[in-house]
């Protein structure tokens, strides 16, 4: 077998920033920061959402800190090219 062709598979500390929950698991993700957890130093990777904070798994509806791309587009450009309301159409006649 050839050497050095596989990514480094190591223990990584994932942090769900919305729920403030830490997960220690193995992954090939590359990180620049490390953090101490339960007396050992691990590579650290922050997450916006995980199973600890996702509405499907928690059963509660909550707003996330980031919007979807479609929602932000509609927020910016929703008024352009839309249909006129009935009151506006009557006033125009």
Swiss-Prot record:
Superkingdom: Bacteria
UniProt keyword annotation of Ribonucleoprotein present: yes
Alphabetized UniProt keyword annotations: Ribonucleoprotein, Ribosomal protein
Transmembrane annotation, as ranges: none
A single Gene Ontology CC term: ribosome
Pfam families: Ribosomal_L31
Keyword NAD tagged: no
PROSITE patterns: RIBOSOMAL_L31 (PS01143)
Stored HAMAP family: Ribosomal_bL31_2
Recorded family membership: Belongs to the bacterial ribosomal protein bL31 family. Type B subfamily.
Official protein name in the record: Large ribosomal subunit protein bL31B
Species annotation: Psychrobacter cryohalolentis (strain ATCC BAA-1226 / DSM 17306 / VKM B-2378 / K5)
């Amino acid at each position: 077998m050839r050497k050095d062709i596989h990514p480094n598979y190591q223990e990584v500390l994932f942090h769900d920033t919305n729920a403030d929950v830490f997960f220690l698991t193995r992954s090939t993700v590359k990180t620049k920061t490390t953090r101490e957890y339960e007396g050992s130093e691990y590579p650290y990777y922050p997450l916006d959402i995980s199973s600890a904070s996702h509405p499907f798994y928690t059963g509660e509806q909550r707003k996330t800190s980031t919007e979807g791309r479609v929602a932000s587009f509609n927020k910016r450009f929703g008024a352009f090219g839309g249909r006129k309301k009935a009151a506006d159409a009557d006033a125009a006649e």
